[in-house]
C-alpha cells in the first residue's frame, strides 16, 4: 500500500447533518494487544476516542470504540456544557480561529484523563502511524474499512493477529469513495464486532472534521491528529476514507479526532 502525502487546500466539502451521540454503556476495558509502530517499538491503544467537557475542563475516553460525537462539536467553546471530540492541533480551545495561535504542540496524553494519572498516554507521530498502517509485517492483512452497525470507520488489527473462527474479513480498502462504500465493502454486526474486539481489534470511526463552527465529512472521512508538525501553520494528520488512507498536512485550527496510545 502506498502512502500519499498531500495538502487539503480547497476541496469541496459536503456537510452531513447526522450526529452519532455517545451512548452510555459501561466503558470497555483498556485494549491490551500490542501494535508495532517501529521495528523496535509497540503500543496499546486507548479503548475509545478522546473526549473533552469544556466547562468543567475534564477529559475521558469514549465508552465504546464506535462512539463519536458528530455535529454538536460545532458548539466548541470554553463555556460549552457538553462533550466534544474534535480538537485543534495539540490543544483543546484556541484563543481564536487562526492557526497562528497554535504554534506549540501539547500532547493530550500528558493530561489527566478520567482516572488515569498524568503522562499515561501519548499521541502517535506521523511516522509511527505510517509504520503501523503500511510498513509493519503483514500490514496489508491487518487493516480494513468496514461499517459496524451503521458506523463507518477503519479497522486495525494487532501484531500476530488471528481472525476469530466464523468471521470472514475483507482486508484493505473499497474500490471507490463515499459514505455507502464502507458498507458495500463489508458490514459487521455488533456480535461480530464484539468477537473482533476480544482479539484486540481497534476501530477508528469516520468522525469527520470541524472547521470553525462547521462539522463536515461525518461518516465519509476520518481525520486523526498526529504529534508531527508540518510547518509553522500546518500539522500532519492521519486521514482515511473508504478507498484510501493518507497522511495529510492540514491547518492546525481544524478540529480532528484523537486516539491516544501508551507504550507497551
Positions of the model-derived regions?
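Terminal low-complexity, poorly structured segments
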Residues: 10-11, 27
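Processing junctions and N-termini across compartments
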Residues: 11-14, 254
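Bacterial signal peptide processing site
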Residues: 21-23
Amino acid at each position: 500500500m502506498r502512502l500519499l502525502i498531500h495538502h487539503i487546500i480547497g476541496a469541496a466539502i459536503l456537510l452531513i447533518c447526522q450526529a452519532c451521540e455517545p451512548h452510555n454503556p459501561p466503558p470497555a476495558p483498556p485494549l491490551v494487544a500490542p501494535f508495532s509502530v517501529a521495528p523496535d517499538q509497540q503500543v496499546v491503544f486507548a479503548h475509545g476516542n478522546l473526549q473533552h467537557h469544556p466547562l468543567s475542563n475534564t477529559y475521558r475516553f469514549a465508552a465504546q470504540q464506535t462512539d463519536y460525537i458528530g455535529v454538536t462539536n460545532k458548539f466548541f467553546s470554553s463555556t460549552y456544557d457538553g462533550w466534544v471530540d474534535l480538537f485543534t492541533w495539540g490543544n483543546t480551545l484556541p484563543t481564536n480561529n487562526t492557526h497562528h495561535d497554535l504554534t506549540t504542540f501539547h500532547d493530550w496524553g500528558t493530561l489527566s484523563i478520567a482516572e488515569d494519572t498524568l503522562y499515561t498516554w501519548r499521541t502517535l507521530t506521523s511516522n509511527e502511524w505510517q509504520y503501523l498502517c503500511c510498513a509493519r509485517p503483514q500490514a496489508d492483512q491487518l487493516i480494513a474499512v468496514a461499517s459496524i452497525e451503521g458506523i463507518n470507520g477503519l479497522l486495525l488489527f494487532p501484531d500476530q493477529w488471528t481472525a476469530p473462527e466464523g468471521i470472514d474479513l475483507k482486508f484493505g480498502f473499497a474500490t471507490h469513495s463515499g459514505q455507502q462504500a464502507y458498507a458495500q465493502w463489508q458490514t459487521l454486526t455488533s456480535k461480530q464486532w464484539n468477537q473482533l474486539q476480544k482479539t484486540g481489534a481497534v476501530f477508528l470511526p469516520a468522525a469527520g472534521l470541524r472547521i470553525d463552527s462547521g462539522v463536515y465529512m461525518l461518516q465519509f472521512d476520518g481525520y486523526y491528529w498526529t504529534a508531527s508538525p508540518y510547518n509553522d501553520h500546518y500539522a500532519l494528520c492521519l486521514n482515511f476514507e473508504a478507498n484510501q488512507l493518507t497522511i495529510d498536512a492540514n491547518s492546525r485550527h481544524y478540529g480532528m479526532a484523537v486516539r491516544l496510545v501508551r507504550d507497551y
